[in-house]
């Protein structure tokens, strides 16, 4: 199957810069702002956005990761280990503005699982969602507050995000 590049390295960098600015506008600065990246690529994107916000505001926004494995609705007996915190961050996120970062927004089920994981133990002031790519085909009433690129796709197509931290290149492709 051939690969069609939708975003190259430069486009990804511009997109991250724009999303960082949009998050700052949404929150009116960095006060009480926390970024949580969904493992794996969302976590790397969250750190890139953190770096960009730091370069804009000279403020290091607390950033962590969220592992939704035990909150997925396609896994049997999810609740058995759901009592453990699914996120790794060194600040209390109660009464904070949390922005969840994901690489590709598709059906909405990953985001629903991340909301379940967060709300099981904490009560943020507000939760926002940033996605590098929104490919449509939602199964749940979920939308991103910050979208890098809307990419209309067929259900049988695959959108892949490659990040140099784990893939040795930066690109978004349709396969």
Swiss-Prot record:
InterPro entries: PRibTrfase_dom (IPR000836), PRTase-like (IPR029057), PyrR (IPR023050), PyrR_bifunctional (IPR050137). Its EC number is 2.4.2.9. It holds the Pfam family Pribosyltran. GO terms for biological process: DNA-templated transcription termination. Substrate binds at residues 40-41, 102-110, 135, 159. Keywords: Glycosyltransferase, RNA-binding, Transcription, Transcription regulation, Transcription termination, Transferase. A motif (PRPP-binding) lies at residues 98-110. It catalyses: UMP + diphosphate = 5-phospho-alpha-D-ribose 1-diphosphate + uracil. GO terms for molecular function: RNA binding; uracil phosphoribosyltransferase activity. Belongs to the purine/pyrimidine phosphoribosyltransferase family. PyrR subfamily. Regulates transcriptional attenuation of the pyrimidine nucleotide (pyr) operon by binding in a uridine-dependent manner to specific sites on pyr mRNA. This disrupts an antiterminator hairpin in the RNA and favors formation of a downstream transcription terminator, leading to a reduced expression of downstream genes. Homodimer and homohexamer; in equilibrium. PANTHER family: BIFUNCTIONAL PROTEIN PYRR. This is Bifunctional protein PyrR.
